[in-house]
Curated annotation (Swiss-Prot):
One of its GO terms (molecular function) is mRNA 5'-UTR binding. It comes from the Bacteria. Coiled coil: none annotated. Keywords: Activator, Cytoplasm, Repressor, RNA-binding, Translation regulation. SUPFAM superfamilies: CsrA-like. One of its GO terms (biological process) is negative regulation of translational initiation. It is found in: Cytoplasm. Its main location: cytoplasm. This is Translational regulator CsrA. Homodimer; the beta-strands of each monomer intercalate to form a hydrophobic core, while the alpha-helices form wings that extend away from the core. The keyword Transcription regulation does not apply.
Amino acid sequence: MLILTRRVGETLMIGDNVTVTVLGVKGNQVRIGVNAPKEVSVHREEIYMRIQAEKSGE
């Protein structure tokens, strides 16, 4: 796992088309913004796991 340190307003790049920006930090919560092409799905992990469970339950 790559571990990076970013400050509010700083961005990291994933490939050529995806950016992740730190929008704010409040206590133990971090707000991030993700810019990605429409064909790239972006989900919180718990939502992604629910989608996968629903797919395998069909």
